[in-house]
Amino acid sequence: MSTPARRRLMRDFKRMKEDAPPGVSASPLPDNVMVWNAMIIGPADTPYEDGTFRLLLEFDEEYPNKPPHVKFLSEMFHPNVYANGEICLDILQNRWTPTYDVASILTSIQSLFNDPNPASPANVEAATLFKDHKSQYVKRVKETVEKSWEDDMDDMDDDDDDDDDDDDDEAD
């Protein structure tokens, strides 16, 4: 069924395929255009550099008049990210406008890596370390970057394991 939200999401997907902003990628699930997987690569010259951070975007039929629900699936240590992965970002709440699309949502989240807002913390510990103990903050962030790589390797191992299982079945 084609609805305004679904048509808009297909346009957003086309834009992401043809002209994705640097360091971000996203696509809908194969069987549900209303749910997207996304990834943000940590920007250069930040403690998040080269991290691979996975996100989930869930849209409803009111999109683009209402923002999607967005959360990190990857572990994240950031002043504006709650422990459950939800993001404290004004455009995902009271400053949302229908002109935002998937690309602009992801680039706005990516900009938080460059410019955290410790004045409006979702993670008080991260905000305090960011303001008062920058070296400890950077150390914690780098640990999450390394964890993001391990998670990616685990995902690849899981894929390999699936292939191995198929080979085992054929050998029997």
From Swiss-Prot:
PROSITE patterns on file: UBC_1, UBC_2
UniProt domain comment: The acidic-tail domain of UBC2 mediates interaction with UBR1 and UBR2, and thus is important for polyubiquitination of histones. This domain is also important for sporulation.
Source species, domain of life: Eukaryota
Enzyme category, top tier: transferase
Self-association state and partner proteins as the record states: Forms a heterodimer complexes with the E3 enzymes BRE1, RAD18 and UBR1. Also interacts with UBR2, RTF1, PAF1 and the RNA polymerase II hyperphosphorylated form. The interaction with RNA polymerase II is BRE1- and PAF1-dependent.
Pathway(s) where this gene product acts: Protein modification; protein ubiquitination
Domain UBC core stretches: 4-150
Catalytic residues (positions): C88 (glycyl thioester intermediate)
Record's GO cellular component terms: chromatin; chromosome, telomeric region; cytoplasm; HULC complex; MUB1-RAD6-UBR2 ubiquitin ligase complex; nucleus; Rad6-Rad18 complex; RAD6-UBR2 ubiquitin ligase complex
Induction: Up-regulated by UV radiations and during meiosis.
Stretches for region Disordered: 145-172
Subcellular location: Cytoplasm; Nucleus
Post-translational modification summary for this protein: The N-terminus is blocked.
The protein's role, per its UniProt record: E2 ubiquitin-conjugating enzyme that accepts ubiquitin from the ubiquitin-activating enzyme E1 and transfers it to a E3 ubiquitin-protein ligase. In association with the E3 enzyme BRE1 and LGE1, it plays a role in transcription regulation by catalyzing the monoubiquitination of histone H2B to form H2BK123ub1. H2BK123ub1 gives a specific tag for epigenetic transcriptional activation, elongation by RNA polymerase II, telomeric silencing, and is also a prerequisite for H3K4me and H3K79me formation.
Record's protein name: Ubiquitin-conjugating enzyme E2 2
Enzyme nomenclature, EC number: 2.3.2.23
SUPFAM superfamilies from the UniProt entry: UBC-like
Comp. bias (Acidic residues): 151-172
Phylogenetic lineage: Eukaryota, Fungi, Dikarya, Ascomycota, Saccharomycotina
Catalytic activity: S-ubiquitinyl-[E1 ubiquitin-activating enzyme]-L-cysteine + [E2 ubiquitin-conjugating enzyme]-L-cysteine = [E1 ubiquitin-activating enzyme]-L-cysteine + S-ubiquitinyl-[E2 ubiquitin-conjugating enzyme]-L-cysteine
Record PTM Phosphoserine, positions in chain: S120
CDD domains reported in the protein's UniProt record: UBCc_UBE2A_2B
Family label: Belongs to the ubiquitin-conjugating enzyme family.
UniProt cross-references to SMART domains, sorted A to Z: UBCc
Keyword Cytoplasm among record annotations: yes
